[in-house]
């Protein structure tokens, strides 16, 4: 699942559902046969381009898979269903190993500061699309201009960045996260680690002229690419997976609902709330701000604009659905939340579960401050995540074997046995 055909898409649930309906007829064997071809920014009709909406859960993974399996069998649409579950797997993998995210986030600024003058010049050329490497420069400009790259192009770009330009993978991952409309902390960080040989230890991805020429239908034939891809060394041993998160008990009675950019389909959380006897009497949205920014550079204006519009759409829908006043808070801060809760005379706040990443980091820091003011912040863990994430203890292929059973638990599609 990748982003928009060209330009900036509408960050609304309505637009995401329209894109889903348009793609569903092509989600079967046609997708499997054509998905690896990158025809360029003017024609991405062979992929779904749904990921910006799924990243913010304007449209949920469950809805996407359910719509596809209402039209196609799992056998026919298996490759696309796997792509949806890849995103779930990456989130689960990082959820069980949050220290990997913490180390990455802390490494970006030092990696930039450690660049020599020639390396800094190479870095500046790479992000500006002026290295002289055919294809690579085009992808850099496409990313900045549209917030999109075909998944295959992302792999080639990362490989050239690491092995041909010999730049730190962390700076490449940061460049992507700041510019991709679908920039997801787990998928992005772990995909770059995979190319570098850190995710599947010792296994790297080498971009070749022949593969790029073939999969771009002759648009690009870059010269001078690295002939080898030695794995990047990591001085931190990979920790064993920790426990998966569990649904926490919710407070009964009157609550306020706080939305953030990681999950903006509050309507589908109603069954969890109803089961706990919860009444939503106020809704607010708050952004983690420059949550994807780093000391390397700020977040792309395209990304910032898409996120702002997505929050507004999610807030309006939630307010209408729960019949509650909806507000936009001035940031995901303790003071803003405290004032909002006080205005509605509530001490219990519910919020969609934020997976490991910048929003989660911000919420975790808020817990103590809010508790000291007598405010309880409870996370709503979706069944999709609760069922899937515990299986992300190893590589994707063992996880993939669980997909039929997970679909049965979700009661999606035809019997996938």
What are these regions (language model features)?
Residues 2-82, 86, 91-92, 96-115, ...:
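Trp/Phe/Arg-rich N-terminal binding region typifying the photolyase-homology
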Residues 51-52, 56, 121-124, 147, ...:
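Flexible, active-site-adjacent loop/turn segments at secondary-structure boundaries
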Residues 60, 64, 132-135, 152:
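Amphipathic, well-ordered alpha-helical segments in soluble domains
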Residues 76-92, 136-195, 200-204:
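Structured ligand/cofactor/substrate-binding pocket environments in proteins
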Residues 97-125, 195-196, 205-214:
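Long, low-complexity intrinsically disordered regions
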Residues 120-144:
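Helix-hairpin-helix/helix-loop-helix acidic hairpins
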Residues 180-235:
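C-terminal, helix-dominated tail/subdomain
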